[in-house]
């Protein structure tokens, strides 16, 4: 396969998911780090950075999930899910739900009379762990984490 052939790159059965998934992962993890920094340093700028990173991560997770589902339907022709692929799918959906839940907490706190709840930090830690585990399994599915 020629790496410069746009048709083969864009129409590969799973390529879009592999490309798109890195954006919400990175943005979410950076937003969690900024939120912890905002809490620790009491700096409002980190709150703002966390919110905007989280917003983009949440919205970017939608096409990432959609392309993941399409990759399963196209590449595996919709066959029954099992093993690592099933776990990756379930954790991916859980990750997306957690990212949106954390975003919603931040979105609600943008109103002047609301403050961010303290339980968001353990929730963000849990979400980051679920995202990391999902990504780890995705690495095995893509062959990146394959045994040498």
Regions found by a protein language model. Name each.
Residues 1-148:
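Polytopic transmembrane helical bundles with strong interfacial aromatic enrichment
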């Amino acid at each position: 396969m020629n790496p410069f052939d746009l048709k083969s790159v864009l129409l590969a059965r799973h390529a879009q998911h592999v490309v798109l998934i890195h954006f919400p992962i990175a943005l979410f993890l950076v937003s969690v780090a900024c939120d912890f920094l905002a809490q620790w340093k009491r700096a409002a700028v980190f709150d703002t950075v966390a919110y905007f990173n989280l917003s983009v991560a949440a919205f970017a997770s939608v096409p990432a999930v959609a392309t993941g589902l399409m990759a399963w339907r196209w590449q595996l022709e919709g066959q029954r899910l099992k093993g690592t692929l099933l776990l990756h799918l379930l954790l991916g959906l859980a990750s997306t739900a957690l990212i949106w839940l954390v975003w919603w907490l931040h979105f609600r706190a943008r109103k002047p009379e609301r403050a961010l709840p303290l339980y968001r930090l353990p929730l963000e830690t849990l979400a980051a762990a679920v995202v990391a585990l999902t990504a780890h399994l995705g690495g095995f599915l893509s062959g990146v984490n394959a045994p040498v």
